[in-house]
């Protein structure tokens, strides 16, 4: 029996809560399963019947555009029934607890919950209390994790670079407040990337981040040298409890990705960004819209990856 709360007694994926602690075999299975779904998204009839009759509830307690929309599209392309809970109009606004909300929705014969919440651990809490036939996907919880974003990033990297084992990857920006960065680091190291770098000012790095197996840089010129993949992160101003930077202009001067800084990486380096982008803060428009950017393909691949996660969970 597995001690991982994401796995069932047979070692199959029961919930997707974080990339941390998941074996490479499960991560690779998700990436492999996503491959044929890319073709589905390119067809005239963008639908397969794998989740016909299943009810998927999207519970987004934080604002979202890409994640919520791509989860909804992914579920509908799998032929599931999708219910988007309007949090502002729900009983949550009247003081109902998170678990009471989930228990009531479970009584409506939900099959899967996709959850985004400002509190770290919210998806784990739900997973601990739902029936064994219900699956939970963490769509982002506080500063903790965003596993499907990391997985679609891994899918994008593999599509462009084929092999994880010879890559030098740099994650640049607000590492301290980023759930994406944590999920990316766990996925990259699990999949065998030999060198993962984080580049940020000291005020935007977690304490003892080196324990995650990353190399820390405070200087873009050194950190970007010979890098294959650049993963840019926005400043999470909504999670900052105090001022950590003199100004966004100063941040862009030292840490914004410009064509000049990108030239320090390998000539065929690719640039990723989970969105939303703040042009002129963490990335220059010339780079964001340039030939080395794979930011829009990330969004497209996100649908296929989320289809893969849902279909695997439904099959477990």
Swiss-Prot record:
Assembly mode: Heterododecamer (2C3:3R2) of six catalytic PyrB chains organized as two trimers (C3), and six regulatory PyrI chains organized as three dimers (R2).
EC category: transferase
Assigned EC number: 2.1.3.2
Molecular functions (GO terms): amino acid binding; aspartate carbamoyltransferase activity
Function: Catalyzes the condensation of carbamoyl phosphate and aspartate to form carbamoyl aspartate and inorganic phosphate, the committed step in the de novo pyrimidine nucleotide biosynthesis pathway.
HAMAP family: Asp_carb_tr
Protein name: Aspartate carbamoyltransferase catalytic subunit
Chain residues that bind L-aspartate: 94, 179, 234
Native species: Nitrosospira multiformis (strain ATCC 25196 / NCIMB 11849 / C 71)
Keywords: Pyrimidine biosynthesis, Transferase
